[in-house]
Regions:
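Helix-to-loop junction immediately C-terminal to a conserved catalytic motif
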Residues: 48
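Conserved ABC ATPase "signature" region
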Residues: 97, 112-130, 155
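Conserved ABC ATPase signature
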Residues: 134-138
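Catalytic Walker B motif of ABC-type/P-loop ATPase nucleotide-binding domains
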Residues: 159-162
Length: 279
């Protein structure tokens, strides 16, 4: 369904990702993980055709993404972007109905079936009661669920989700991952960016670890989420252990490193005099 071959990606003349190769099959939920700035969102935008490839190749459902027309692309893959700034008074219903645009001719407005699909998606993500509320007046979590409903309304076989759990509370974070797993069980393919490593370990069939502009690891969660790989990628001590209650993998950091230096900086910020320092 998704294939990248020796892909180089970036923007503004800067190379962010180098020589990235992987494939995602039908029905898989694959998580892109790694530190901030590693290139996860850049990779997703490149695969979606938002950013141009610097070199290499990328395929979507067997076709080169460079030759796909906009509507054809939109019928194959929906994209949930990381941040959406909205100042106009578009309501949740307006936003979700926009997910139906790949199926509309320029002269055709939404019909009853489009509205029914949009409302079903809003009900599924728990925002139907917000249908007439402007998006810019909503909380971050409400807005994220509206945007997820829009992606669903697009009814595509492939979903690119950039941090779909951002801004959500613990219950909805897990619900998003459960929902993605249900989609994949129905045959859809999901490639998502995740910072919630413990949830990614539970719900993703595979993980791609991005770090230092490269694909550092590709495999099952237990193969990728190791102390050594995560410490290398994040540049700080990371530990992976089994939760004795849930028996799921949990990821921890060792915060002690650098605490002494941070304490000195905090004393400056708070105006706390150091020992031996005279006024």
């Amino acid at each position: 369904m998704i294939c990248a071959d020796a892909l180089y990606a970036g923007y503004d003349g800067k190379v962010i990702l180098e020589n990235v190769s992987f494939s995602v099959g039908e029905g898989e939920i694959v998580g892109l993980i790694g530190p901030n700035g590693a290139g996860k969102s850049t990779l997703l935008k490149t695969l979606r055709g938002i950013l141009p490839m610097l070199s290499g190749a990328a395929m979507l459902m067997g076709d080169d993404i460079k030759v796909l027309a906009a509507k054809d692309f939109a019928r194959r893959a929906a994209y949930l972007q990381q941040r959406v700034e909205m100042t106009f008074d578009y309501t949740a219903r307006d936003i979700v109905l926009a997910g139906r645009y790949p199926y509309l001719s320029w002269w055709r407005q939404e019909k009853a079936d489009d509205l029914a699909i949009a409302e079903a998606c809003m009900e599924y993500t728990g925002v139907l009661e917000l249908a007439d509320k402007p998006l810019h007046t909503m909380s971050g979590g409400q807005r994220q669920r509206v945007l997820l409903a829009k992606v669903l309304a697009q009814q595509t076989p492939v979903l690119f989700l950039d941090e779909p759990a951002t801004g959500l509370d613990l219950i909805y974070q897990e619900e998003i991952f459960r929902f993605c797993r249900a989609l994949c069980a129905a045959g859809k393919t999901v490639l998502l960016v995740a910072h919630e490593l413990s949830l990614a370990a539970r719900f993703c069939s595979r993980l791609l670890l991005i770090g230092r502009g490269m694909l550092l690891a590709d495999g099952a969660p237990q193969e990728v989420l190791t102390d050594e790989l995560l410490t290398h990628a994040y540049g700080a001590p990371v530990r992976v252990a089994e939760n004795p209650i849930t028996h799921h993998m949990e990821v921890y950091t060792e915060a002690e490193k650098g605490d002494a230096e941070k304490a000195q900086l905090l004393s400056v910020i708070l105006g706390t005099p150091d020992e031996g320092r005279t006024a």
